[in-house]
Design a protein with these regions (language model features):
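Short glycine/threonine-rich loop/turn motifs
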Residues: 107, 134-235
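Short, glycine/charged-enriched hinge/interface segments at domain edges or termini
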Residues: 2-134
């Protein structure tokens, strides 16, 4: 177990020859797949884990490990420890972001022709990770308004992440990517090989590298999208 865990994991007592690790807090679970395969190919011992890059809750089981025979040579265990090095095979990274802003864009929503149903969806998803929405606005499709609102959210309202909804396609009226770019944010990716959610944008703003995300409309109505894959990793 020593080669597996970091400080965010609790170790179970030995039961039926097996030891399990559980999450000591909510966070993102990560697995070093190459070194895990090394251990499991060594013979006479095994480690089974849940998938890496997945969000977990406090108390969730992360892995189980045991030796296959009744006994094993101490030298073999030591050899595996030396091959794996000092870094644990598994990491549980606590979420750092606690405050977010939601900026809903679109002329029809701004003028009240249709109801903003995007913001409630995001508030519910953020609540699953104990992230508070400290600032929310409904904005017209004008890049200068969206740019100003992003800066206000971060510099005045204390948002540690900004979510911009709508206006993410290549239509002339969809100006959210331009608005994000005009803040001076560093664009990491515009477009993702994921469906639903191909028109996703990820950027980071300012010295503190505050995440600013552009979310396509599918996030509003699809149960699982690129946002659900990316959010735990951004947090």
């Amino acid at each position: 177990c020593d080669i597996c865990k970091n400080t965010m994991m609790d170790e179970s007592p030995v039961k039926e020859g097996k030891i399990e690790l559980a999450a000591a807090a909510d966070g993102l679970f990560k697995v070093d797949g190459a070194r895990l395969r090394l251990v499991n190919s060594f013979g006479q011992m095994m480690i089974a884990t849940r998938h890496g890059n997945t969000p977990v809750k406090k108390g969730d089981k992360l892995c189980g490990t045991r030796i296959i025979p009744l006994v094993i040579e101490k030298e073999k265990m030591q050899r595996v420890r030396e091959l794996c090095g000092d870094e644990p095979l598994l990491q549980l990274l606590p979420y750092k972001i606690k405050k977010a802003a939601v900026l809903a864009t679109g002329s029809e929503v701004f003028r009240g022709r249709i109801k903003d149903t995007f913001t409630p969806v995001l508030e519910e998803k953020l609540a699953e990770f104990n992230v508070e929405v400290v600032y929310k606005q409904v904005l017209d499709d004008k890049p200068e308004q969206i740019t100003a609102a992003i800066k206000t959210a971060i510099e005045e309202k204390g948002a540690e992440m900004v979510l911009c909804t709508g206006g993410m396609s290549v239509d002339p009226d969809d100006r959210t990517p331009l608005a994000i770019k005009n803040t001076g944010a560093r664009i990491v990716s515009y477009g993702a090989p994921v469906l639903p959610g191909a028109m996703f944008l990820l950027s980071y703003y300012g010295e503190k590298q505050v995440p600013v995300l552009g979310l396509p409309g599918c996030v509003m109505y699809a149960k699982r999208t690129i946002f659900d894959l990316g959010l735990p990793r951004v947090l």
